[in-house]
Amino acid sequence: MNDILTQLGKVLEERKLADPDSSYVASLHAKGLNKILEKVGEECTETILAAKDAEQDGSTHNVIYETADLWFHSLVMLSHLNIAPQEIMQELARRFDISGLEEKASRGKK
């Protein structure tokens, strides 16, 4: 999975410099962070609704599709802020051996 995130991160970085008329990602970057955040919020809502539907009807296709959209737009946001996907992977790896309760408690100390 890390390979696809690395590849996608590279493509997203390249698209920051592309013509906004030729690339969806470039057009998001050109419109700025607020537009990107709007898309992240929209995809988050769609993911939540798909999950609720999946619980009712047992179909996971839309949850997978909407989660992919959410991850994609989150990666665009990170790219816009010059944060590489590897930085998120490192943070997840750091948390892997920490219980959720310990991690949550440590946030209050920062």
UniProtKB/Swiss-Prot annotation:
**What is catalysed by this protein?**
1-(5-phospho-beta-D-ribosyl)-ATP + H2O = 1-(5-phospho-beta-D-ribosyl)-5'-AMP + diphosphate + H(+)
Gene Ontology molecular-function annotations: ATP binding; phosphoribosyl-ATP diphosphatase activity
Coiled coil: which residue ranges?
none
* SUPFAM superfamilies found in the cross-reference section: all-alpha NTP pyrophosphatases
Cellular-component GO terms for this entry: cytoplasm
Subcellular localization, as worded in the UniProt entry: Cytoplasm
The pathway noted for it is: Amino-acid biosynthesis; L-histidine biosynthesis; L-histidine from 5-phospho-alpha-D-ribose 1-diphosphate: step 2/9
This protein's source sits in the domain of life called Bacteria
Q: What is its EC number?
A: 3.6.1.31
Describe the family membership recorded for this protein in Swiss-Prot or TrEMBL. Answer: Belongs to the PRA-PH family.
Q: Which NCBIfam families match?
A: histidine_hisI, PRK00400.1-3
**What is the protein name stated in its UniProt record?**
Phosphoribosyl-ATP pyrophosphatase
- Organism equals Hahella chejuensis (strain KCTC 2396)
